[in-house]
């Protein structure tokens, strides 16, 4: 990964790791038991063949606690989409989330990358996977889906042409193409995952896109997605895109569906 993204991901990951290591010292983690359905869903996902062990998806030992935190069948995921998209650093997540990430990359992320840059995504930078903690770092509130390996925070994308797109820089201050790419990836995530949060949703998600599979919005449809984005970005504006610290000049669109 490029130096800028590497420093970003490493720096933010250190903070996330500290939370994961020490977040369970107090809070609502040591009472109750992990819901049995979680382990059953993990097992069904693996036995159903949604995800297979490989050089980039490695089974790990069961994570049992502290408290309700953990996974029955955790995976160390260093690559997605048949290994064509590197995950940096490798993520500790469950099978259901791994399968959903594969689908999202195939149906939303790669088509958007080809459409706006004529290049495919080869790496995503994540800053939080499994971690025993509460939502938004509040250990006395509701337990985060990160505590069950059922969530991932994505901070950056790297393309095959060398371009790096970080959520922190490009969401608000990126070129029209960068913003359109992130909007398309975000909108696609809202169809694939149950909870999706990005910059503008609250002060905790200013630098990443959070995705998880917890059904939190059953009364109003199954998906909770914030912020709500306006549809479309006029690509005519992209001809004069200014250079940013996270971008190179976009290439003409040559991906699937090009005329």
Regions found by a protein language model. Name each.
Residues 1-24:
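Sec-dependent bacterial lipoprotein signal peptides
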Residues 9-14, 28-34, 54-56, 210-212:
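Short, intrinsically disordered, charge-biased short linear motifs at domain edges
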Residues 18-44:
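Bacterial Sec signal peptide processing site at the extreme N-terminus
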Residues 27-31, 60, 64-67, 75, ...:
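Catalytic cores and adjacent binding grooves of peptidoglycan-active enzymes
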Residues 37, 44-125:
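Active-site acidic/histidine clusters and adjacent loop/turn architecture
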Residues 115-149:
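Active-site-adjacent substructure of cysteine-protease-like catalytic cores
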């Amino acid at each position: 990964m490029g130096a800028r993204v590497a420093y970003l991901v490493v720096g933010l990951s250190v903070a996330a790791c500290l939370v994961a290591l020490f977040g369970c010292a107090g809070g609502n983690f040591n009472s109750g038991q992990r819901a049995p359905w979680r382990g059953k869903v993990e097992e069904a996902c693996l036995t159903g063949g949604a995800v297979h062990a490989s050089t980039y998806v490695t089974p790990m030992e069961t994570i049992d606690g502290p408290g309700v935190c953990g996974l029955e069948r955790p995976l160390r995921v260093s690559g997605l989409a048949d290994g064509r998209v590197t995950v940096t650093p490798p993520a500790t997540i469950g099978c259901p989330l791994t399968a959903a990430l594969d689908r999202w990359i195939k149906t939303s992320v790669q088509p958007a990358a080809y459409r706006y840059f004529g290049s495919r995504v080869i790496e995503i930078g994540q800053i939080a996977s499994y971690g025993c903690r509460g939502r938004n770092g509040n250990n006395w509130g509701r337990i985060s889906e990160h505590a069950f390996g059922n969530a991932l925070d994505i901070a950056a994308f790297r393309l095959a042409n060398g371009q790096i797109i970080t959520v922190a820089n490009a969401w608000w201050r990126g070129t029209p193409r960068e913003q359109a790419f992130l909007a398309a990836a975000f909108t696609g995530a809202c169809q694939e995952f149950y909870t999706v949060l990005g910059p503008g949703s609250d002060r905790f998600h200013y630098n990443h896109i959070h995705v998880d599979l917890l059904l939190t919005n059953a009364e109003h449809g199954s998906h909770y997605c914030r912020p709500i984005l306006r549809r479309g970005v006029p690509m005519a504006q992209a001809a004069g895109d200014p250079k940013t610290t996270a971008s190179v000049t976009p290439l003409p669109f040559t991906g699937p569906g090009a005329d």
